[in-house]
Amino acid sequence: MDDLDALLADLESTTSHISKRPVFLTEETPYSYPTGNHTYQEIAVPPPVPPPPSSEALNGTVIDPLDQWQPSVSRYGHQQPQSQSPIYSSSAKSSSASVPRDGLSSPSPRASEEEHVYSFPNKQKSAEPSPTMTSTSLGSNLSELDRLLLELNAVQHNPPSGFSADEVSRSPSLPNVTGPHYVIPESSSSAGGKAAPPTKEKPKRNGGRGIEDVRPSVESLLDELESSVPSPVPAITVSQGEVSSPQRVNASQQQTRISASSATRELDELMASLSDFKFMAQGKAGGSSSPPSTTPKPGSQLDTMLGSLQSDLNKLGVATVAKGVCGACKKPIAGQVVTAMGKTWHPEHFVCTHCQEEIGSRNFFERDGQPYCEKDYHNLFSPRCYYCNGPILDKVVTALDRTWHPEHFFCAQCGVFFGPEGFHEKDGKAYCRKDYFDMFAPKCGGCARAILENYISALNTLWHPECFVCRECFTPFINGSFFEHDGQPYCEVHYHERRGSLCSGCQKPITGRCITAMGKKFHPEHFVCAFCLKQLNKGTFKEQNDKPYCQNCFLKLFC
């Protein structure tokens, strides 16, 4: 606790360097901050430019109030010792930082609301500070304040050994304070009389109060730092002697305006950094007790985000009614829901089993309890066409123990689609009726065309009935008898003619004995002399002009 007291004292001394310097803003919102033991007078008509404080005011020299101010104006006494700090109280603080003297007229209610005179710890200055040095000192003081706040946070998150965790948790929290409470002693009305300097009350620290008792004091110091840059209130004009150089006043006002705005900006950045640091420290303190988590897989990041979103909504009091349990991740569904196959799904979890693409509002197919997109289902499970080997999506033709697209089932020879008459199969291929019989049906021995209906089997060949006739005279065979010569059917006459067994005299077939002469065949009774018609049976004859003659007729006729 001694280290904490030292930090608070160092913090108070740091803010006293900032608060004792008067800051002047623009003419629209002129402010003055009295330092030292001066009494200021409100002037009804303000001058065009607020005068800078004199060196006596900055150095804390006491000026006789009777010589400086008119007696008809209400006076406010502000006296602060150099070595003492303001008194801090844990109760709610008053928004006014000045207390009117006893015996003087109190300001009107409007003046008490709009005019605030702030008193800050003052130290003697040997000379008027330059604006450059003041701005540099302000930046260094803010940096020092930032460092002290970081150390204070470290002490708050790690309580001293003298405090147990139960004491810290049971320590009562103090009410919020709106600003530091300054107790200002009343000045004596007699010239030269001064009141005794007030004593500073340090924050009480005992065993019954925890680390949270220190925080109001730190917040009071921060409020004191914020009060160095005042909020806009009606102008307060201070008359404090002659202004020797208007150019110097303008330059001083511009420099102090820059310093004031810079201090405000740095203070905002400091407060933002302090909030971020507290948030990070709480996160680290909460995460130190839990074991280190492994890096989540990319596939589970979405599930983690959904789970954290639902928990955050529950913490905020937003009731999320589950619409079901997802069939994939087995987690409740709070947003959009997909109902399919008797289950409910997250839209991003209802995906194709094969390609893992989100199905959404597209058509899908079910197989063994698993959803498939239309493309993958047909590629995996649909029958394939025997002709193109592609999946069959719509109508299917089943033939020859195979499946076909209707547009791919046609005659293998002519490419014509099969009609009502159907098709014929040969060697695993389908043919139309015409091409099948033309290619594979038995051919007629007479016309060489396919035999489609009745036929005659003869001479090891099939014949149309109308085609089985004599190959010479095309006469149908009576009683079914025919003669064959060189694999062709003939009638008896043409058969003997083809073979040469036809009598040359009577032009009838020779069925018995025959005589062969002059390259011809004759019945014995039909081989006679061409002149006398006597039978030439002795075996001797004369031939003249392809005709036979007996010996006597030949001599008579030709000798």
Swiss-Prot record:
Any one GO molecular function term: metal ion binding
Assigned keywords, A-Z: Cell adhesion, Cell junction, Cytoplasm, Cytoskeleton, LIM domain, Metal-binding, Phosphoprotein, Repeat, Zinc
CDD domains noted in UniProt: LIM1_Paxillin_like, LIM2_Paxillin, LIM3_Paxillin_like, LIM4_Paxillin
Start and end residues of each LIM zinc-binding domain: 326-376, 385-435, 444-494, 503-553
InterPro entries associated with the record: Paxillin_Lim_dom2, Paxillin_Lim_dom4, Paxillin_TGFB1I1_LIM_dom1, Znf_LIM
Main location as per UniProt: cytoplasm
Chain span(s) of sequence motif LD motif 5: 301-313
Motif range (LD motif 1): 3-15
GO biological process, one term: response to muscle stretch
Biased composition (Low complexity): 79-98
Residue stretches in coiled coil: none
Region ranges (Required for binding to PARVA and ILK): 263-282
Motif LD motif 3 in this chain: 217-229
Bias (Polar residues): 121-137, 237-262
GO CC, any one term: stress fiber
Top-level taxon: Eukaryota
Motif range (LD motif 2): 144-156
Subunit record text: Interacts (via LD motif 4) with PARVA/PARVIN and ILK.
PANTHER family found in the cross-reference section: PAXILLIN (PTHR24216:SF11), PAXILLIN-RELATED (PTHR24216)
Biological role: Cytoskeletal protein involved in actin-membrane attachment at sites of cell adhesion to the extracellular matrix (focal adhesion). Binds in vitro to vinculin as well as to the SH3 domain of c-SRC and, when tyrosine phosphorylated, to the SH2 domain of v-CRK.
Protein known as: Paxillin
